Amino acid sequence: VASSIVRYMRYREIDPETPLLFGVGNVTELIDADSIGINAIMACIAEEIGVDLLFTTEASAKTRGSVKELKVASYMAKAAKLKKTPPKDLGLNLLVLKEKTKISAEEPSGKIIEGKKSDEFIRDPKGDFRIWIWRDKIICKHDKATIVGKTAKEIVDTVIALNLVSRLDHAAYLGRELMKAEIALKLKKNYMQDEELNFGTYK
């Protein structure tokens, strides 16, 4: 990557007029890292060099969303260049899993009880649910109905309205699983019922 960037820089020094195409997809597809950060840095490098066109692909699951990411990154890079500032505090960003500021939390007081996981399982007499993601929707299947939605709340609210759950522990389980599915849907991650989401080094 570094040697290719050097060649781009040298060419631009020789010829400042001919439009240049930057194949960002060649980088995002060939490294097992989240595309959003790679697209951000590559767009900034391209802007500094004077590249005119950015090209990317969404050929694999790990690069889904790259077109949108690179579009935002190019806006950030151009705005930073015009303002003569680093690409931050611009009114738009590519922060997804991290945030710039930390909200201070209230320190707990009074009687504090350490939470403990219960291994007890009692099946809900109203039946079980199967949950999965299909075509950018969360599917929640019960013997009496299949509920489809994009958020945990709209599905849970429908489950309650249809009176499909009778136990508090089952309702709590359903809420946890549906929220996992919603997060997976937003981040374009795999979702498997009863399995933790894979956050790599952030386990």
What are these regions (language model features)?
Residues 5, 14, 31, 36-41, ...:
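Weak global preference for isoleucine
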Residues 23-25, 37, 50, 65, ...:
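Residue-identity detector for glycine
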Residues 1-96:
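Catalytic alpha/beta core domains of metabolic enzymes, predominantly
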